[in-house]
A protein has these predicted regions:
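Bacterial carbohydrate/catabolite-sensing allosteric modules
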Residues: 31, 69-77, 95, 101, ...
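Short beta-strand segments enriched in small/hydrophobic residues
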Residues: 4-9, 43-57, 155, 162-170
Length: 191
């Protein structure tokens, strides 16, 4: 047998453990179908290896790609995603944020125009705003939608297309697609 401290050192890869002891511990873990207790680990670290991802529409093609790529990148680094679909409802977003806090997430990727991220800095929870402007100190990742619209129209014109038509966005609702439409229409008017 070995002590609980030795098992802990093997699992957490801390301190010197001989190769023989390490193999012995792993063999016993496999035989017993042992799974580390993530809650206990989170208690000592004060966070889990989970990243909260809050998106407004889980079925939108843009967010489908974002979810897939973030999940792959997180998995490579040993993290899991906690996926939340807010349906652009501020109260739902707040509920999800509270859930992320109570679940001790390591960070939050947030696509919201309603939530102010200052409170998370006070709690030392890293937040990245995606496709929405954030507070001054918050990391924000945004597409240049205007330029994207221009590039799309220019490409179609260069391919010989005429009488271009643009579909996108929701009438009366401020959306990133509006900026793409502006860029698209500018190129169409100039040519």
């Amino acid at each position: 047998g070995v002590t609980a401290t030795t098992v802990s050192r093997v699992i957490n890869n801390r301190g010197y453990i001989s190769e023989g002891t390490r193999k012995k511990v792993y063999a016993a873990m496999e035989e017993m179908h042992y799974q580390p207790n993530e809650l206990a680990r989170a208690f000592s670290k004060q966070y889990t290896n989970t990243i909260g991802l809050i998106v407004p529409h889980i079925s939108h093609p843009f967010f489908i790609k974002v979810i897939s790529n973030l999940e792959s990148s997180a998995a490579e680094k040993g993290f899991k995603l906690l996926l939340c679909n807010s349906k652009e409802q501020p109260e739902k977003e707040q509920d999800y944020l509270d859930m992320c806090i109570s679940n001790r997430v390591a960070g939050i990727v947030l696509c919201s125009k309603y939530v102010q991220t200052r409170e998370f800095r006070k709690m030392n929870i890293p937040v990245v705003n995606l496709e929405r402007g954030g507070d001054d100190d918050t990391i924000s990742v945004q597409c240049d939608n205007y330029q994207g619209g221009k590039l799309a129209a220019e490409h179609l014109i260069e391919c010989g297309c005429k009488n271009l038509l643009h579909f996108g966005g929701v009438a009366g609702k401020d959306m990133p697609a509006d900026r793409r439409a502006d860029g698209f229409l500018r190129v169409c008017r100039e040519r």
